[in-house]
Amino acid sequence: MPTWTEYILYKKLGKTPSPGDVVEIVPDLVGFHDLTGYHVLEVLESMGKVEVFDRERVVVAFDHLSPPPNQRAAEIMVYIRRHVKALGLPNFYDVGGGILHQIILEKYALPGQVIFAADSHTNTAGAVGAFAHGMGATDIAAALKLGKTWIVVPAPFRIDVVGEFPIGVMGKDVALHLLGQFGAEGFNGYSVEVFVETPKAFPMDDRATVANMSTEMGADALMFIPDVITAEYLKTERGVDYTPPRIEPGNYADKYTVELPRLEPLVAAPYSVDNIKSVREVEGVEVDQVFIGSCTNGRLSDIAVAAKILKGRRVKSRCIAIPASYEVFRRAMKLGYIDVLTEAGCVVTYGTCGPCLGGHFGVAGPGEVVVTTSNRNFRGRVGHPDAKIYLANPAVAAATAAEGKIADPRPYLRG
C-alpha cells in the first residue's frame, strides 16, 4: 500500500515517484506574506506580464511587518496592496487579519492538498494532512505565474504517537522531544507521517505546533494522517464533511514511536533548537520577557492554558501575548481569556509575527533572557545577539511569567 505522501503525489502526477526524483507539481494553494511578498512580486514583475494562474488559490497575509513599525514596512505594504488589487486576489488579509500559516490552517487547508508558500513554516498545514512546504520567493513567483513548480520527492518517515499527554505537556514538547532525538537536521529529505493511536488525545492545535516545528527538524513536510479529529475540525471550523481514508501501512525509510506518557515539559535552551532540557534542569533562571503566541503556539488552547495559569495573578516579568489570528483573538476575548491576561499585566495584541523575528512589538535587549513559545532561538532571533532565548510550551511560558523565572507549570495546573 502507498504511504500518505505517495498517495498525495500519485493523485497529482498519475504515477508514484521515487524518493529523490525531481517532479513538477500543481499546487492546490499558494501563499505569501508581507516580508516575502515584496520579493515574490518583484520576481513576478521580472517575468513579464504580472498574472497568477488562479486567483482563488492564492492567499496573502500581512503578518511579519504588521502593523508597519517603520516607513519602509509601510512602503512594502503599499506596494503589495497595489498588486493584490490589480490582480483581483480575493484571499487577502491586511493588518490584523492574522499570521499566514494560521489563516491557511483555519480557512483553506484540506487533507491531501499540496500547499506551497513563501515561508519556511508553511509545514503548519500538515496538521490536517496537507503536503505543505515552504519555498523561496523565486519558486513561489513561478508557481503563481505558471501554476506549477518543482520539488525533490522526499522519502517517507513514519512516527507513531501512543498514549495521552501528561499534565503540563503539550504538542510543543513532542516537537522538542523529536528535536532532542533527531537534531535540527534529522529529517532532511523526509516527509514525516504521524499516526496517532488515540486521536482524541492529540488535539488539532497540538498537531499544528508539531507540524510547524518540523521545519526546525529539517523536514520537507510533516503530515498527521487524517482521522476523526481531522474530520471534526473541518466540520466545526469550515462546515466541510470529510471521511478519513483507511490508510494501510506503507513502506517507510524509517520509523519512530513517541510515547506521550513518558514526556515532561521541555525547553530548548540557547542557542539551538535541539539543545533540549527538562524544565527542571533550568528552573529558577531569571527571565526578563515572556512571549506567548506566534504561528507555533498562538492558537486558542495555547491562550487558554496561559489564562488558566495567570488567572488571579500578576506577571513578574514582561509578558506579551499574541493570538495568531483575528479569529483566535475574537474567541479568546469571548471566553474571557484576554481579560485574564490583561488583568495579569500582559500586553496583548493579535495577528503579528513581530516579537518572533525580533522585528517589533517586543524586541529583546542585550543580555536579556526571553522565554518564548515561538520556534527559533538562535542568536539575534528575538533582538540583540546577546539575548538568551528559551523555547517552551505556553504552560511553561505562563508559569514563568507568573514567577519571573523559568518555572514548571505542573503545580499550577494541578492546583
Curated annotation (Swiss-Prot):
Its EC number is 4.2.1.33. InterPro entries: Acnase/IPM_dHydase_lsu_aba_1/3, Acoase/IPM_deHydtase_lsu_aba, Aconitase_4Fe-4S_BS, Aconitase_4Fe-4S_dom, HAcnase/IPMdehydase_lsu_prok, Homoacnase/IPMdehydase_lsu, IPM_dehydratase_rel_enz. Its cofactor is [4Fe-4S] cluster. Keywords: 4Fe-4S, Amino-acid biosynthesis, Branched-chain amino acid biosynthesis, Iron, Iron-sulfur, Leucine biosynthesis, Lyase, Metal-binding. GO terms for biological process: L-leucine biosynthetic process. SUPFAM superfamilies: Aconitase iron-sulfur domain. Catalyzes the isomerization between 2-isopropylmalate and 3-isopropylmalate, via the formation of 2-isopropylmaleate. This is 3-isopropylmalate dehydratase large subunit. It comes from Pyrobaculum aerophilum (strain ATCC 51768 / DSM 7523 / JCM 9630 / CIP 104966 / NBRC 100827 / IM2). The gene is leuC.
